[in-house]
A protein has these predicted regions:
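Conserved SAM/AdoMet-binding glycine-rich loop
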Residues: 2, 6, 108-226, 237
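A structural micro-motif
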Residues: 19, 42, 142-143, 211, ...
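Radical SAM enzyme [4Fe-4S]-AdoMet core and its adjacent flexible, acidic
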Residues: 126-142, 188, 249-282
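Short, conserved catalytic or interaction motifs in soluble domains
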Residues: 85-90, 190, 223, 241
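Conserved, mostly hydrophobic/aromatic
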Residues: 80, 100, 117, 147, ...
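Proteins enriched for Cys/Gly/acidic motifs involved in redox and nucleic-acid/cofactor modification
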Residues: 1-118, 124, 173, 195-206, ...
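Short flexible coil/turn linkers enriched for glycine and charged/polar residues
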Residues: 63-66, 76-78, 169, 179, ...
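Terminal RNA-binding accessory module
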Residues: 259-351
Length: 351
């Protein structure tokens, strides 16, 4: 359940039939807690609000044998007004660099080709995220590193430098913008401006002109005007994102934004979202054309929709479709790009 002691106390006193309640910090102790409930007939309520230790032996289920998620930290300290995560996941706790290094090295030794480092805000990793990237880049093997999510207020030139210096780190940054309007960003408690965000983009593109960015956007935040929404539309054209993940604002009970008057109808939010997606479609179609005639290294993750086609993603996290044999699934393939759409690339297998 949510990492909230008050909620647990309410359940304990109100619902006598409930025998077990635990927060996200106690998940690794599930076996022991169940034993207490079943064998000792106890009611167990474990909400550790300030837990600092991380169980490094906790088993993680992997979906496939070539791409793996590796958490480097848990929780969040940012308290964006629309987000419930800090309340349900607790405060930030970081794994040690050595623990992360050992896990990644083990996965690479087992044949994994892609490692995705995870954190609600990897840039606030307490041991220094650029330093962690450089350390992991030293691991021998044919693999690539990705990470998410990044918060613009903590992302700077040191992060971009590490990405560009490390050959195993993908030259792509998913940097959640949420809005291109400064007033809305302030209401969201994001603690950066559109100009701050653009400085990061300009620095990266100054070093590597085709550096890839993707982002998250919220449409119809409480109090947002159409003119402010249009600032976001203009901003995505300015940045030239490869991809955006956009959502209409939805109220989350327990957040600051839930107390704000939501004066925008669901219908209006939907219309704005459609408008935003159409704008991004034009941006993507033009910007992705930069890959035509170039070679991409693609990690093949499965069959395509058409017979005989395969699909995967290049280092910039863009979908690439091409014709090839199923034996390539789970491996890297070099693909010559022949066509660009607004959401994917198409190419021909080299060799």
């Amino acid at each position: 359940m949510a990492q909230e002691k008050k909620a647990a106390d309410h359940i304990k006193s109100t619902y006598r039939q409930v025998d077990l309640v635990f927060g996200t910090f106690a998940f690794s102790k599930l076996y022991e807690m169940l034993a207490e409930v079943l064998k000792e007939k106890k009611r167990v309520f474990n909400i550790e609000e300030n837990a600092s230790e991380i169980d490094e032996d906790f088993y993680q289920l992997r979906e496939n044998k070539f791409s793996a998620f590796v958490p480097i930290m848990y929780g969040c300290n940012n308290f964006c007004t629309y987000c419930i995560v800090p309340y349900v996941r607790g405060r930030e706790r970081s794994r040690t660099p050595q623990a992360v290094y050992d896990e990644v090295k083990k996965l690479v030794g087992e044949g994994y080709k892609e490692i995705m480092l995870l954190g609600q805000n990897v840039n606030s990793y307490s041991y220094g995220f650029p330093a962690l990237l450089r350390k992991l880049n030293e691991i021998e093997g044919d693999f690539r590193l990705r990470f998410m999510s990044s918060h613009p207020k903590d992302a700077g030139s040191d992060l971009i430098d590490a990405i560009l210096e490390c050959d195993k780190v993908c030259k792509h940054l998913h940097l959640a913008l949420q809005s291109g309007c400064d007033r809305v960003l302030k209401e969201m408690n994001r603690r950066y401006t559109a100009a701050d965000y653009m400085k990061i983009v300009d620095y990266a593109r100054g070093k590597k002109p085709d550096f890839s960015f993707s982002t998250d956007l919220i449409v119809g935040f409480p109090g947002e005007s159409y003119e402010e929404f249009c600032e976001t539309k203009e901003f995505i054209k300015k940045v030239k994102f490869d991809n955006i993940y956009s959502f209409v604002y939805s109220r989350r009970s327990g957040t600051k934004a839930a107390e704000m008057p939501d004066n925008i109808s669901d219908k209006q939010k939907g219309l704005w979202l459609r408008e935003l997606l159409l704008e991004q479609r034009e941006v993507s179609e033009k910007w992705l054309s930069r890959f035509i005639g170039k070679k991409c290294r693609v990690l093949v993750d499965g069959k395509g929709k058409e017979e005989g086609m395969l699909t995967g993603k290049n280092d910039e996290n863009i979908i690439v479709n091409f014709r090839g044999g199923e034996e390539l699934i789970g491996n890297f393939a070099d693909v010559a790009i022949t066509n660009a759409m607004n959401w994917a690339l198409k190419g021909e297998l080299i060799g």
